[in-house]
């Protein structure tokens, strides 16, 4: 009579269910318990040079901030004429506009329905209003101490780098917030320049380097990757050269930062990928594959 339950236990096949009573102890583990275990089935295999290429977006934005600060310092010290900066920026914007339109082939213009004349009018309206409000921008923060202005500018530029759209699908990404923080930093720094003309040109330059330049970067990266790499290298060396003219120590530290982001970080990412171990099985939460947007409208 005592051996009968044991025989039944061997004959009954264990099932992975909780709604049936089974002749097994609560801590029983069957051989088939982990037969559906899968590891790293959705893991992406990264290649070193591909990661280096993607890191160039971060390099570009760091260099943009560096160039902006260097240009501001040159204008504040009286080493750069505002007329020269305005002319150079205007010519660069025109070249970038033509290059963007050439690479894009007019597809973006067709989708948006905008014409070249509409773009020209928008540019003229922006320049006119910015020039008209430049005296206000110059005197906007007169009652605020210079140290506070510099601290605000630093925090705004850091926020710009944090919230910038580097191509990642993350909740923290906000292109609008990133651009607004960069413009706010430019207004803060422009208010400490000698004249209203300096403030006007500084804000205009901020729009060019923080709003227009990233658009051309993305287009070059998507359509002409080799040209994009060349532009990134040229831009990085230009930023380093400008920073070197101000501070050798700062240029060395900035160069180490760029090398770490573009070379060391991808290397460690590839190395750490060997230790990645995500497990998947029947215990995973159910995923709804069907598009439910029609029920939400």
Swiss-Prot record:
GO BP: GPI anchor biosynthetic process
Keyword field: Endoplasmic reticulum, GPI-anchor biosynthesis, Membrane, Transmembrane, Transmembrane helix
InterPro entries to which the protein is assigned, alphabetical: Plno_GlcNAc_GPI2 (IPR009450)
Superkingdom of origin: Eukaryota
Chief place of localization: endoplasmic reticulum
GO CC annotations, alphabetized: glycosylphosphatidylinositol-N-acetylglucosaminyltransferase (GPI-GnT) complex
Membrane topology category: Multi-pass membrane protein
Listed pathway(s): Glycolipid biosynthesis; glycosylphosphatidylinositol-anchor biosynthesis
Membrane-spanning parts: 67-87, 88-108, 153-173, 239-259
Keyword flag Transit peptide: no
Subcellular location, record wording: Endoplasmic reticulum membrane
Family that this chain belongs to: Belongs to the PIGC family.
Role this protein plays: Part of the glycosylphosphatidylinositol-N-acetylglucosaminyltransferase (GPI-GnT) complex that catalyzes the transfer of N-acetylglucosamine from UDP-N-acetylglucosamine to phosphatidylinositol and participates in the first step of GPI biosynthesis.
Subunit record text: Component of the glycosylphosphatidylinositol-N-acetylglucosaminyltransferase (GPI-GnT) complex composed at least by PIGA, PIGC, PIGH, PIGP, PIGQ, PIGY and DPM2. Interacts with PIGQ. Interacts with the heterodimer PIGA:PIGH.
The protein, known as: Phosphatidylinositol N-acetylglucosaminyltransferase subunit C
Gene (name only): PIGC
């Amino acid at each position: 009579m005592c051996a009968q339950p044991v025989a039944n236990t061997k004959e009954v096949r264990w099932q992975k269910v909780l709604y049936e009573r089974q002749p097994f102890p609560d801590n029983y583990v069957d051989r088939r318990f982990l037969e559906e275990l899968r590891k790293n089935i959705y893991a992406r295999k990264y290649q070193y040079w591909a990661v280096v290429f993607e890191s160039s977006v971060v390099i570009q934005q760091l260099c943009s901030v560096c160039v902006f600060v260097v240009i501001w310092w040159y204008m504040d010290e009286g080493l750069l004429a505002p007329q020269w900066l305005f002319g150079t920026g205007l010519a660069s914007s025109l070249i970038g506009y033509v290059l963007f339109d050439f690479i894009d082939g007019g597809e973006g213009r067709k989708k948006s329905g905008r014409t070249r004349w509409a773009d020209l009018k928008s540019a003229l309206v922006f320049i006119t209003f910015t020039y008209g409000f430049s005296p206000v921008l110059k005197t906007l923060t007169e009652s605020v101490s210079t140290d506070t202005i510099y601290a605000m500018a630093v925090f705004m530029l850091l926020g710009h780098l944090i919230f910038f759209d580097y191509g990642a699908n993350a909740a923290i990404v906000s292109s609008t917030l990133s651009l607004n923080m960069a413009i706010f930093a430019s207004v803060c720094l422009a208010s400490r320049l000698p004249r209203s003309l300096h403030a006007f040109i500084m804000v205009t330059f901020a729009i060019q380097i923080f709003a227009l330049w990233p658009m051309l970067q993305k287009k070059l990266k998507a359509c002409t990757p080799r040209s994009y790499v060349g532009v990134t290298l040229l831009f990085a060396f230009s930023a380093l050269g400008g920073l070197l003219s101000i501070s050798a120590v700062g240029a060395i530290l900035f160069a180490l930062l760029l090398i770490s982001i573009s070379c060391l970080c991808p290397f460690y990412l590839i190395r750490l990928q060997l230790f990645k171990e995500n497990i998947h099985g029947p215990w995973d939460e159910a995923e709804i594959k069907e598009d439910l947007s029609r029920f939400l409208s």
